[in-house]
Regions:
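Phosphate- and other anionic-substrate recognition elements at nucleic-acid/protein interfaces
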Residues: 1-8, 12-140
Length: 140
């Protein structure tokens, strides 16, 4: 689907955020949002600013595919987001996105210490890029 897609890597301290280009081809990192009472409002502002067509939220399933406490927290947060934004909200499996993001940052010469501030949004980029690639494949 053409248009800007937003993606969130939900966390208890920070929420990593990424957006796509208007063609829905490339994921681009945005500044992470501090988790807390204002997070949903901040995300709603980004939906408006970028005229997003949807919001993709990472669902942190366990490696066996089952849902644990983190997945339940992400589901609850996604439900709250859906009540605030006027676009579809979709939960997408995010297993290993943070690992992939850490690996990419390490290969770019970033240490764990210097990656801390950007890892959440880097994970959101991995999540969104995977989503965009899957959407393109299904459109073929």
């Amino acid at each position: 689907m053409p248009g800007v897609h937003l993606a969130c890597d939900f966390g208890t301290a920070r929420i990593g955020v990424a957006r796509s280009d208007p063609a829905g081809i490339l994921a681009i990192p945005l500044d992470a949002i501090a988790a807390g009472a204002d997070a949903i409002g901040a995300l709603g502002a980004l939906v408006s600013e970028y005229e997003a067509v949807d919001v993709i939220i990472g669902l942190p399933l366990k490696m066996d595919g089952s849902a644990g406490p983190a997945a339940e927290s992400a589901r609850a947060w996604a439900a709250m987001v859906a009540q605030v934004v006027d676009v579809p909200v979709e939960l997408v499996d995010e297993r290993l996105t943070t690992v992939q993001a850490q690996r990419g940052l390490h290969q770019a010469g970033r240490t764990v210490r210097t990656s801390r501030a950007v890892i959440d949004s880097a994970a959101a980029v991995v999540l969104l890029q995977s989503y965009l690639d899957a959407q393109r494949k299904s459109d073929l």
